[in-house]
Each structure stands twice: as structure tokens, then as C-alpha cells.
């Protein structure tokens, strides 16, 4: 788990069937709060997660 925003952590996953990476975001209690779309590279998925966490966190 990696922190993507204040109080928001996430886990990078590979969707084998779809052939791409996505990040599932969770709050501190472990409740799912969001998910990025599919990206070809892990780096792009992480960047999308940072942007999504900023929107969710209200920054």
C-alpha cells in the first residue's frame, strides 16, 4: 500500500484479462473510496491515482 493523498492509500493491481494497470484507493479504515481507469503502464496508473486522491481529498 502506498499513500496517494492525505488519509488515502492505494494498491496497484494488474488486470490480466484487460492487459492494464489500475489503482484501487482506500481510506484509513480500509473502505474502498475510488479506482482509476486502466493504464498501459504502472507509472501512468500511479499518476492517475494521485490526481484522483487529490479530488477525493478535496485538495
What would you call each of these model-derived segments?
Residues 30-44, 52:
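A short, exposed loop/beta-hairpin motif centered on an aromatic-Gly-Thr core
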Residues 14-36:
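A short, structured beta-strand/loop element
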Residues 1-22, 51, 55, 59:
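Short N-terminal "domain-start" leader segments
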Residues 4, 25-26, 42:
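Hydrophobic alpha-helical segments, principally membrane-spanning helices and signal/leader peptides
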Amino acid at each position: 500500500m502506498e499513500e496517494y493523498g492525505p488519509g488515502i492509500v492505494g494498491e496497484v493491481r494488474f488486470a490480466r484479462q484487460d492487459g492494464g494497470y489500475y489503482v484501487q484507493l482506500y481510506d484509513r479504515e480500509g473502505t474502498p473510496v475510488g479506482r482509476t481507469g486502466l493504464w498501459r503502464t504502472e507509472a501512468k496508473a500511479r499518476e492517475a491515482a494521485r490526481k484522483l486522491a487529490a479530488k477525493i481529498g478535496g485538495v
